[in-house]
Amino acid sequence: MIALVIQPSSEADLEEPILEVEGLSVVRSGKLVIQDIDLTILKGEFVGIVGPNGSGKTTLLLSILGILNADSGQIKIYGSKPMSKNLDGKISWVSQAASNLPSDLRLTVRELVELGTLNRSNMFSRRRDKQQVDQAIEMVGLKDVENTDIGRLSGGQRQRAVIGRALASKAEFILLDEPLVGMDSESRSSLLKLLDDLCHDADKTILMVSHDLAAIRQTAHRMIYLEETIKFDGDTSIFPDLTELAELRGIKPVHDEVHGHHHHSHKGAGEDL
């Protein structure tokens, strides 16, 4: 009965599971890529996923989005299956291709962000859309370049514009796949601050995959180490250092700089996974 549907209080909201994954296994091209994944993400969490190349990080994201089918197990987002109609506008994906948009793309920042407002239910309410777009552009710090073509922006600015599109959609759950790729350290820091602000001030829930261990440590509340299955899931403050990670993987580390203050963006610096 409809009368029994009660809006939870904001206090209960804090414990509301946004994502529930149980016993998820996915086979791609005949190979088991992820197996027996159990994962629950609560409203307002910022969760980082790290792991070596080919460990199943992107596969997990694509499964959550419903782009890849599970071979076993189940996924629920806001209590619904991936791709359900009632998830329209609630979930948004920022892929690593965002910063590689073609340089001759004839689309301004504002036009790209506006795409986020289009869905089945709001095709005719342009006034509200404009307000959403203005707010999203402001939040990602691109007001000065809102009428500039995407192709003329730096990789970091492009990535911000794509996140702006996600914000304009009013999505509450944002998934990011390697959003820091190709960014200089200044762009990376400002993007991480933006994501942190979105969690704290805008009540978003974020799931981010990255090779950049130091960046995830700096921003995420909770970290997951994935290598086919989840080998660590806990508070960022107790995430293993590289020596302990090597033990998880059964390999010897080259060297460990995670607890130092070095923050290299290139591979082989001891910080990238």
Name each region found by the language model.
Residues 65:
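Helix-to-loop junction immediately C-terminal to a conserved catalytic motif
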Residues 73-87:
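Conserved ABC transporter NBD signature motif
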Residues 114, 127-145:
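Conserved ABC ATPase "signature" region
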Residues 174-178:
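Catalytic Walker B motif of ABC-type/P-loop ATPase nucleotide-binding domains
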Residues 210-211:
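H-loop/switch region of ABC-family ATPase nucleotide-binding domains
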Residues 223-235:
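H-loop (His-switch) and adjacent beta-strand-loop-beta switch element
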Residues 237-273:
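ABC ATPase nucleotide-binding domains
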